[in-house]
């Protein structure tokens, strides 16, 4: 599988008391569904998945799936510290009809996050997952940065189709791309650069860019007030 297009990671809206605002979530997903985006990422870091209970995660996945347009590719953030719990949530996402699982690196026991442990975790998930799996590396949040060498090794697994690389390390991305060229699958890299992103977000709401895409302000698209730091919006998605 080779992913094409833009996949915005949606927020999870809350009431002031901390409960999930499901009607607003439904409205937000419907708005995203009316954009040219190829799909939607549910329960990523922006979706605050790590702060939700297992039942809340399931309810968010269900609500988002029901509200999404049928032509959108849906990516479910299903990664937790346990491989077994990750698989349970992934299986639920598959039952709902999600297309891909995005699994963050486990990180709580950092001293135990050896190469062997990471390989075992992702291979266990990939072996049993009913969905294709994307590795999610976000060292700024987890404190663990999966080495490029491990990603290259994991790329050999047919059910591991890519990585969301949020370290901002362009050299690492280059190394991963070069290291997976031998694999008989397509490879694509999409990067968000600091010099481009602020200009894109500054575009008029609903306006058309001469470079080929409709640009919608994040606050309008989300349907709720939000604040976004554009200081270092650098990340890359690599499909392998």
Could you describe each region identified by the protein language model?
Residues 1-145, 151:
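Active-site beta->alpha loop and helix N-cap motifs at the rims of alpha/beta catalytic domains
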Residues 124-128, 139-240:
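Catalytic alpha/beta core domains of metabolic enzymes, predominantly
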């Amino acid at each position: 599988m080779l992913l094409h297009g833009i996949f915005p990671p949606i927020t999870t809206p809350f009431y002031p008391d901390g409960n999930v605002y499901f009607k607003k979530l439904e409205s937000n997903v419907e708005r995203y569904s009316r954009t040219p985006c190829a799909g939607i990422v549910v329960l990523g870091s922006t979706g605050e998945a790590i702060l939700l209970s297992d039942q809340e995660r399931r309810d968010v996945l269900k609500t988002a799936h029901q509200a999404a347009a049928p032509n959108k590719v849906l990516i479910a953030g299903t990664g937790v510290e346990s491989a077994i719990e990750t698989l349970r949530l992934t299986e639920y996402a598959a039952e709902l009809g999600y297309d891909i699982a995005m699994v963050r690196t486990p990180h709580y026991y950092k001293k135990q996050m050896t190469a062997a442990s990471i390989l075992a975790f992702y291979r266990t998930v990939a072996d049993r997952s009913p969905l294709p799996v994307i590795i999610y590396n976000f060292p700024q949040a987890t404190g663990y940065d999966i080495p490029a060498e491990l990603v290259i090794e994991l790329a050999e697994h047919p059910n591991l189709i890519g990585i969301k690389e949020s370290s901002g390390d362009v050299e690492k991305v280059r190394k991963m791309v070069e290291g997976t060229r031998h694999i008989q699958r397509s490879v694509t890299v999409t990067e968000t650069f600091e010099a481009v992103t602020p200009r894109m977000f500054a575009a008029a709401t609903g306006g058309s860019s001469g470079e080929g895409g409709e640009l919608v302000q994040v606050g309008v698209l989300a349907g709720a007030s939000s604040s976004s730091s554009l200081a270092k919006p650098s990340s890359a998605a690599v499909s392998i």
